[in-house]
């Protein structure tokens, strides 16, 4: 019956009667009480007379003496209708949620832990009883802040709805409890929305789950408000540390702030098939912390010694009475505002409290016991996420250790080497972690910044690190420690420049800490004024750095002092990170020592002669026994190449070995690259910062593959040329050095020519007019010149290489552009000749798996009708676009321009297929020559009015091909096909970064022999050969590996157009090698799988093969092509990889040096 009693509603001194209405959605008051008020919005209002739009006002009312702020609408009635939400005290039914909290136990714990006197504890107990409605009594209980609702959907672009993540089944019961409790309190409502945000459950330390929503999509389109939280470091530095300290946690503070109903939609999320919206500020929303903190700060203004950081409140006083009085004021304001307090997370009237993750005492701030427990529970990480979590935890306490940065550097160096589920954690990393934990557990308290005192900054530097300490003037305890590890550039600085670098970085932070006070800098520099007289020859840093350093001398806020108590730079001890690079050979079963050497050739050319030496030891019962040694000559290469080659050789020998293995090299570059840089190089595609291929790229790729096969091999660096008693590795290192030096002299020690028997017979038969061996034509002359077998043919003298070296020559010529048989033959015939060259080349081409995967069906095509071509260069250009390709460096198209007479090709990557891009490219190209005719298809890039005007100004005739008839532009269309094949084979097994390969593709296209003319496009265009490296005539080995490194990767055969793969002009047979078509291959990926044998023939059109997954599969021959270069269905060699017969017959011998 109490609900039927009228209520007293007061507005601006006018009192009227009001009645509680359980069905009212909004409070209604007479319009006379709203005179002079401006409406905040409009809303549809439903009454017995229908639905109509009305103005909504936000006003202050008193209902039964209680002041409230609420939204109302005006009516013609002379009394007020009040919604239940505005008078929650009318319904005396207590709040009931899922999990009840024990307030008596929490209050008792706070009373027992406080340092209050007996009287003070009684007063605190009375405060607990007085503000009983202020304490959180249920888990997920929410306050109700009566303020104007926030407008949060302030962006101009609607966010994109997001899909829901997979939910851990263990989290669903806890999340459901939270949603049910919030629905009871009106914090959530069930409502459909065009937006959706995924729910992301996060585990709590107690084993339960917290409901978190991923509002990144909403935050991306929401403007950031200007009011933001103060940085926690600034708050910690300005805390008043009285005897009595209290920290208060405002429970679910964001959920106490209402938002306007028209913004509910942007907060929506889906749970168990139903969509819910927040009626309050959601957690995770961009502007929630700023809006909430700003309200709490305004609410607590006037209370001394109070600091607020989001939902954490700190208050401290020296007097017990004063502290309790201000707690009473603080509790009253929070209760009247509608907040609730979590006593479980609060600490009242104590001498030591935890605030913002630190322990606050009268001495200063320190690390909490909870943080130290987390340190003790750290274990070696096995995933990248665990490593990052450990680094984040340690980095929180970085200001408590003077040399923190240099100690943690080895752990940060693991990040680029780690993968999602692998971290290369070693013993030295565990030692580093233990050192950090020990120092953090023993770290002293740091003092807070006192704004009435001058800031003292003390700096010093070692060879690798700069050290900084901040103090309040006259105090002994530091405010903070900072350490700076010098970069690679800064390590080259002089001692003075390293100190100035440390001063510069320290002052950047000191200006924030100074609080308007002066800064005094103490350093080992005797006179800062004298550094202006530093001569240019004594400077290693750039002039811009010196300018910024000297600018501090003019700043009136900063004064510099010499501190004679600081140790001189040269006397600082070396940094000990606990890392021992020495690996004793007795701890390993197999030990390899590698070295490389190079000497200058005594010949007129002055080439380098390189050699490598490798020694292999076995550990038997603690005694090292030399097992084998190698001394191998490498020809015209650098010493660095020899070091890498020797290292690669040792890794290959490690593959079949069992047990732990140690490889020792005297090259710091090789050891550091293998241990620290190789994984980063592999992830970047073996290019440097300028996107250029690394030196010796082919060797490093091989080493990376070997490391993946044997990641357990330990590699260490040992300086060379040491005395035998100075290191356990000295003997093996010196022996490897002797073998490498010996190998570098081998080229000139060998005097007898290494000829085959048939070559010797041919020379002798020619001299004695006897019968020549089979395959050697009698019309030619055969002689021995410079230890080489030479033949005089119609086109001049040619070398006949030994049979064991012919495979290398064919492989080298083919790998330049993976050309076909005729093109390879022409390339080799420039310098060499031997019997049955075509047969040997065909045998080799049949072994190239990459060509088999990309080349079309190799059947003889029908000859097309001859096309009349121009006879002079630059008369006519064909042009067309390739693309869109996968994005690379922002480019998605390639403009191909082909000279009609010579076939010379220009490739220009573009970001768009437009006339502007075309004109830009042709302006560059016409700087060489202006063509008479430009032939293209009828694409918009070539038919626009702008392009036609450009051509008219240069007197260029435009010629277009017939629509839907690409044969009209056959020359450029064929080039397009060749370019795509080149890029496809080049990118096999590599990321689709084709932009940096365009220049190499163009070089390969223009320097591949055309069978019809027997010349390359470059020769036809310019009349001379391109400066393209081919073979080392002295050692039959590559002489310019860096230039060939990328060309060697181009895997494409520039064949003539052939019939489509669906051509049925072949019949399968059992045992035949065939290749299956790839279903819908992506751009720049192979179109055919690797060769496999035909197992059974079901009918003339269907066969059974073993597919790439190892399963038997029936396939139509329309989806197959016969593998090229087969003879009666068998390979030329039994090697499963299809190795050439010459290679199979060749026996590889290793030079074993007698240990005596």
Curated annotation (Swiss-Prot):
Annotated residues for binding of Mg(2+) 3: 875, 937
Segments of skewed composition (Polar residues): 1144-1156
Modification comment: Specific enzymatic cleavages in vivo by viral protease yield mature proteins. The protease is not cleaved off from Pol. Since cleavage efficiency is not optimal for all sites, long and active p65Pro-RT, p87Pro-RT-RNaseH and even some Pr125Pol are detected in infected cells.
Disulfide bonds: none
Reaction catalysis annotation: Endonucleolytic cleavage to 5'-phosphomonoester; DNA(n) + a 2'-deoxyribonucleoside 5'-triphosphate = DNA(n+1) + diphosphate
Residues of the Reverse transcriptase domain: 183-360
Binding site for Mg(2+) 1: 249, 311-312
Binding residue positions for Mg(2+) 2: 595, 643, 666, 737
Domain (RNase H type-1): residue spans on this chain: 586-745
A GO CC term assigned to this protein in UniProt: host cell cytoplasm
Domain Integrase catalytic: start-end pairs: 869-1025
Alphabetically ordered keywords of this record: Aspartyl protease, DNA integration, DNA recombination, DNA-directed DNA polymerase, Endonuclease, Host cytoplasm, Host nucleus, Hydrolase, Magnesium, Metal-binding, Multifunctional enzyme, Nuclease, Nucleotidyltransferase, Protease, RNA-binding, RNA-directed DNA polymerase, Transferase, Viral genome integration, Viral penetration into host nucleus, Virion, Virus entry into host cell
Active-site feature positions: 21 (for protease activity)
Cofactor note: Binds 2 magnesium ions for reverse transcriptase polymerase activity. Binds 2 magnesium ions for ribonuclease H (RNase H) activity. Substrate-binding is a precondition for magnesium binding.
Protein role: The aspartyl protease activity mediates proteolytic cleavages of Gag and Pol polyproteins. The reverse transcriptase (RT) activity converts the viral RNA genome into dsDNA in the cytoplasm, shortly after virus entry into the cell (early reverse transcription) or after proviral DNA transcription (late reverse transcription). RT consists of a DNA polymerase activity that can copy either DNA or RNA templates, and a ribonuclease H (RNase H) activity that cleaves the RNA strand of RNA-DNA heteroduplexes in a partially processive 3' to 5' endonucleasic mode.
Name the UniProt record assigns to this protein: Pro-Pol polyprotein
Organism the protein comes from: Feline foamy virus
């Amino acid at each position: 019956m109490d609900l039927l009693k009228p209520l007293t509603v007061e507005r601006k001194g006018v009192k009227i009667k009001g009645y509680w209405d359980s069905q009212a959605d909004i409070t209604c008051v007479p319009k006379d009480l709203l005179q002079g008020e401006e409406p905040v919005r409009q809303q549809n209002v439903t009454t017995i007379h229908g639905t109509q739009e009305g103005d909504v006002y936000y006003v202050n009312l008193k209902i039964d003496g209680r002041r409230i702020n609420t939204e109302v609408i005006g009516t013609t009635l002379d009394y007020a209708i009040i919604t239940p939400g505005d008078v929650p005290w009318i319904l005396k039914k207590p709040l009931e949620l899922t999990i009840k909290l024990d307030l008596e136990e929490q209050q008792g714990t706070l009373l027992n832990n406080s340092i209050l006197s007996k009287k003070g504890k009684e007063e605190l107990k009375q405060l607990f009883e007085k503000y009983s409605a202020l304490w959180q009594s249920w888990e997920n209980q929410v306050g109700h802040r009566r303020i104007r609702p926030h407008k949060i959907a302030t962006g101009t672009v609607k966010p994109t709805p997001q899909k829901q993540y997979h939910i851990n089944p263990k989290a669903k019961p806890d999340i459901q409890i939270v949603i049910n409790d919030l629905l009871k309190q009106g914090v959530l409502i069930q409502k459909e929305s065009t937006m959706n945000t995924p729910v992301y459950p996060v585990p709590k330390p107690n084993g339960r789950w917290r409901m978190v929503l991923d509002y990144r999509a909403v935050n991306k389109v929401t403007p950031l408000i200007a009011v933001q939280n103060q940085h926690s470091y600034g708050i910690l530095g300005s805390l008043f540390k009285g005897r009595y300290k209290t920290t208060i946690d405002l429970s679910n503070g964001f959920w106490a702030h209402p938002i306007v109903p028209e913004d509910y939609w942007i907060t929506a999320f889906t749970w168990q098939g139903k969509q819910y919206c927040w009626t309050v500020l959601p957690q995770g929303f961009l502007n929630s912390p700023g809006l909430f903190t700003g309200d709490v700060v305004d609410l607590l203004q006037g209370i001394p010694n109070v600091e607020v950081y989001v939902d954490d409140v700190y208050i401290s006083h020296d007097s017990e009475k004063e502290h309790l009085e201000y707690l009473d004021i603080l509790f009253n304001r929070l209760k009247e505002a509608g907040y609730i307090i979590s006593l479980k997370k609060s600490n009242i009237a104590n001498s030591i409290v935890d605030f913002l993750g630190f322990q606050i005492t009268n001495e200063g701030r320190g690390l909490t016991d909870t943080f130290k427990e987390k340190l003790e529970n750290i274990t070696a990480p096995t995933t990248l996420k665990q490593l990052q979590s450990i680094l984040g935890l340690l980095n929180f306490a970085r200001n408590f250790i003077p040399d923190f940065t240099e100690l943690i550097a080895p752990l940060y160096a693991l990040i680029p080497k780690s993968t999602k589920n692998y971290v290369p954690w070693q013993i030295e990393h565990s030692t580093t972690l233990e050192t950090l934990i020990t120092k953090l557990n023993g770290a002293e308290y740091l003092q807070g910044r006192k704004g009435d005192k001058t800031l003292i900054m003390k700096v010093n530097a070692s060879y690798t690190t700069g050290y900084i300490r901040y103090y309040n003037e006259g105090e002994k305890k530091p405010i903070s420690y900072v350490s700076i590890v010098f970069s690679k550039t800064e390590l080259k600085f002089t001692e003075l420049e390293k100190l100035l670098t440390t001063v510069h970085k320290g002052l950047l932070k000191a200006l924030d800490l100074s609080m308007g006070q002066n800064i005094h800098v103490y350093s080992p520099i005797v006179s800062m004024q004298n550094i202006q007289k530093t001569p240019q020859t004594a400077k290693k840093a750039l002039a811009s750095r010196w300018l910024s350093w000297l600018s501090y001398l003019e700043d009136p806020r900063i004064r510099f002092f010499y501190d004679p108590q600081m140790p001189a730079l040269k006397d600082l001890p070396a940094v000990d990170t606990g890392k021992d690079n020495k690996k004793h050979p007795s701890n390993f079963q197999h030990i390899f020592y590698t070295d490389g050497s190079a000497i200058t050739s005594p010949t007129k050319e002055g080439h380098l002669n390189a050699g490598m030496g490798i020694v292999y030891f076995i550990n038997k019962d603690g005694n090292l026994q030399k097992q084998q040694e190698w001394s191998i000559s490498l020809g015209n290469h650098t010493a660095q190449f020899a070091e890498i080659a020797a290292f690669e050789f040792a890794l290959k020998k490690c593959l079949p070995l069992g047990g732990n293995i140690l490889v020792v090299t005297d090259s710091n570059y090789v050891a550091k690259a293998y241990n620290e840089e190789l994984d980063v190089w592999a992830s970047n595609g073996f290019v440097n910062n300028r996107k250029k291929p690394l030196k010796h790229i082919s060797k490093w790729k091989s080493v990376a593959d070997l490391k993946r096969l044997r990641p357990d091999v330990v590699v260490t660096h040992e300086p060379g040329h040491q005395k035998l008693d100075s290191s356990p590795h000295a003997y093996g290192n010196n022996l490897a050095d002797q073998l490498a030096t010996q190998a570098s002299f081998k080229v000139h020690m060998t005097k007898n020519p290494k000829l085959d028997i048939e070559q010797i017979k041919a020379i002798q038969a020619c001299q004695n007019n006897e019968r020549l061996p089979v395959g050697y034509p009698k019309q030619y002359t055969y002689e021995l010149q410079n230890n080489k077998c030479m033949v005089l043919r119609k086109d001049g003298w040619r070398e006949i290489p030994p049979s064991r070296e012919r495979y290398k020559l064919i492989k080298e010529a083919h790998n330049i552009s993976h050309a076909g048989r005729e093109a390879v033959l022409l390339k080799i015939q420039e310098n060499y000749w031997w019997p049955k060259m075509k047969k040997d080349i065909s045998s080799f081409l049949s072994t190239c798996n990459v060509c088999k995967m990309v080349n079309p069906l190799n059947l003889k095509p029908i000859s097309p009708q001859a096309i009349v071509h121009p006879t002079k260069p630059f008369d006519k250009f064909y042009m067309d676009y390739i693309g869109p390709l996968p994005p690379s460096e922002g480019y998605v198209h390639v403009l191909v321009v082909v000279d009609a007479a010579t076939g010379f090709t220009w490739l220009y990557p573009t970001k768009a297929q437009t006339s502007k891009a075309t004109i830009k490219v042709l302006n560059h190209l016409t700087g060489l020559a202006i063509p008479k005719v430009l032939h293209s298809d009828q694409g918009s890039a070539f038919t626009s009015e702008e392009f036609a005007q450009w051509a008219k100004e240069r007197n260029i005739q435009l010629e277009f091909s017939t629509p839907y008839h690409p044969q009209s532009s056959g020359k450029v269309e064929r080039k397009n096909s060749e370019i795509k094949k080149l890029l496809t084979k080049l990118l096999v097994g590599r990321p689709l970064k084709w932009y940096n390969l365009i220049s190499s593709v163009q070089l390969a296209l223009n320097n591949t022999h055309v069978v019809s003319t027997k010349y390359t496009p470059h020769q036809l265009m310019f009349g001379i050969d391109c400066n393209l490296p081919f073979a080392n005539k002295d050692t039959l080995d590559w002489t310019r590996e860096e230039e060939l490194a990328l060309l060697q990767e181009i895997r494409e055969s520039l064949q003539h157009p052939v019939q489509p793969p669906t051509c049925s002009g072949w019949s399968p047979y059992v045992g035949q090698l065939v290749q299956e078509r790839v279903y819908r291959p992506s751009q720049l990926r192979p179109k055919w799988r690797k060769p496999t044998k035909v197992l059974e023939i079901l009918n003339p059109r269907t066969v059974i093969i073993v597919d790439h997954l190892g399963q038997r599969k029936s396939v139509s021959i329309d989806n197959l092509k016969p593998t090229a270069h087969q003879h009666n269905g068998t390979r030329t060699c039994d090697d499963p990889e299809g190795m050439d017969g010459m290679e199979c017959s060749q026996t590889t011998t290793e030079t074993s040096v007698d240990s005596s």
